[in-house]
Amino acid sequence: MVMKRIAVMLVLCLYSPVSAFTIATGPNDGSYFQIAQDIKNVAAKEGLDVQVTSTKGSLENIHLLGTGKVDSAIVQLDALRFVSDVLKQQRGLDLFDAIKIVLNLYPEEIHVLSNRKDIQSFYQLEGKRVSVGTEGGGTAITAAVLFTVYDIKAIASFDAFEDAVKNMEQGNLDAVLFVGGAPVPFIGKLDNRFHFVRLPANAILDEIYLRTKLGGPQYGWAQSDTETYAVPSAIMGLDKKDENYASQMQALVLSILNSADDLRANGHQKWKSSIIQSYFPNRGYEPTNQLIQLFNILDSRGYKIVKK
């Protein structure tokens, strides 16, 4: 089908972004940073200047966003409520209702790794030493959810992934958790001395996460596929009543939607499982929700939105 082009007079057509648009991500060797670099590249083709900021994780991302130091942030959806509560308690910032989902991105797999043959299921982590990533990061938040739901009392430690793997090799740790879009480059560098630990199906987790598998398709060293869950991630922004901010958000989202095929072909592998055309009616940012709905309607009829 030949894609037809249509110019639509939206807010984004009335207000032109005049300054760089900042997005908080995560460590510069993680999936968020790579995804944001892809976004930066496609946005540049539309004349949008996106600056990618590396961070320690979700706690820092939401704090930077809530205090206005960045325009947007990539965050795991299960982290928003948890981190908002922490920031309200520790720093007096009430951010939950002020932060909205600008664009859904993709599900991030929960990687649980061990080099011990007697640890095959998450239930076998009872009383074990488990690294849950850096303090305040999305992995630590997801780990807290898993330990609570599975009712597992483990000895948790906060470590960078490389340090955690070294400690596990030296016998000082029994397992390592990491949440990230597979394939994660540094996990891909491991070998078959390690294996993935299964996350058993759970009705509560089924309401929060997406059921999936990790194995050979993502990591060549994996000897079998292992059941796990994935955490949806999204670009989040502030619920500002500011027309220029709304214009920037809409322009950014439109550049991503219009570049979906290019991103799937040439960007990070997670774009192949992206959920960018979905939206949350209540938690979503209204200006971009409206744009996504319009995009979906026109896309289903073979039209494409272009800026005028």
Please name every model-derived segment.
Residues 5-18:
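Sec-dependent N-terminal signal peptides
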Residues 163-172, 176, 180-191, 196-198, ...:
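An extracytoplasmic/periplasmic, membrane-proximal ligand-sensing/linker region
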Residues 23-24, 29-76, 223:
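Extracytoplasmic small-molecule ligand-binding "clamshell" domains
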Residues 77, 88, 152-245:
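Pocket-lining segment of extracytoplasmic ligand-binding domains
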Residues 53-92, 165-167, 182-190:
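Pocket-flanking alpha-helical
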Residues 129, 133-146, 211-281:
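Ligand-binding clefts/hinges and TM-proximal coupling segments of bilobed small-molecule sensing domains
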Residues 92-105, 218-226:
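A structural signal for short loop-to-beta-strand junctions that line the ligand-binding cleft
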Residues 21-44, 51, 108-166, 170:
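Bilobed "Venus flytrap"/periplasmic-binding protein-like clamshell domains
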